């Protein structure tokens, strides 16, 4: 893949992460735009700026999310993750943007983005959804997913999930090397 694709995927992944973080650490968008949410960290910040980074407002976080998704949509235009579905592509970006617009109660924009997200997909038939379903990323209706196999686990402990090796609560996570991470949590 080209650097353009990698950059688009990185922006989409950051938007996805902030979309989840802002929902976990603050009330939803409408009516709470000025409430403090989470700090925003970007690649343009210096180390000093990252370490002295106050919590951004909900509005600022959503502005960052939409900026990242808009850039990602441009960079990933025409890119399709194919049958593997383990990479962020243009359809996934529009799906994420639809979700962000729903949370901001921008219903018309959400509908447009959702239409763009599913335009290349194949909805499941009534017969398909009448049996246990939504359990395989190989389904035509899935936009993004990872097919977990014994060959693609990210750690050798038998735990096969993405955040398991990033967690600071484990002795084996990458973030466990940050000894004073919890002392830096803003309690305001």
For the regions a protein language model found, what residue spans apply to each?
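Well-ordered alpha-helical segments within folded domains of soluble proteins
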Residues: 40-43, 92-99, 142-145
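Hydrophobic-face positions in mid-chain alpha helices that act as interaction patches
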Residues: 87, 105, 111-188
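Aromatic-anchored glycine-rich loop motif in surface-exposed flexible loops
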Residues: 1-78, 82
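Extracytoplasmic/secreted envelope proteins and their assembly/folding machinery
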Residues: 7, 18, 62, 66-69, ...
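Aromatic- and glycine-enriched pocket-lining scaffold segments that form the walls
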Residues: 76-117
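Secretory-pathway/luminal and periplasmic proteins that interact with or process carbohydrate-rich
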Residues: 17-28, 103, 120-127
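Helix N-cap and loop-to-helix transition residues
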Residues: 54-57, 89, 125
């Amino acid at each position: 893949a080209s650097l353009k694709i990698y950059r688009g995927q990185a922006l989409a992944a950051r938007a996805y992460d902030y979309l989840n973080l802002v929902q976990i650490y603050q009330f939803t968008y409408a009516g709470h735009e000025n409430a403090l949410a989470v700090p925003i960290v970007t690649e343009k910040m210096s180390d000093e700026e990252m370490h002295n980074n106050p919590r951004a407002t909900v509005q600022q976080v959503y502005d960052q999310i939409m900026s990242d998704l808009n850039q990602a949509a441009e960079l990933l235009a025409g890119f399709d993750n194919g049958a593997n579905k383990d990479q962020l592509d243009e359809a996934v970006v529009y799906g994420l943007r639809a979700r962000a617009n729903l949370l901001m109660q921008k219903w018309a924009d959400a509908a447009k983005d959702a239409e763009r997200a599913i335009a290349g997909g194949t909805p499941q038939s009534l017969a398909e959804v009448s049996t246990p379903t939504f359990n395989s990323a190989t389904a035509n209706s899935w936009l993004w997913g990872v097919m977990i196999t014994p060959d693609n686990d990210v750690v050798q402990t038998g735990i096969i999930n993405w955040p398991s090796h990033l967690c600071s609560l484990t002795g084996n996570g990458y973030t466990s090397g940050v000894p004073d991470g919890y002392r830096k949590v803003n309690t305001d």
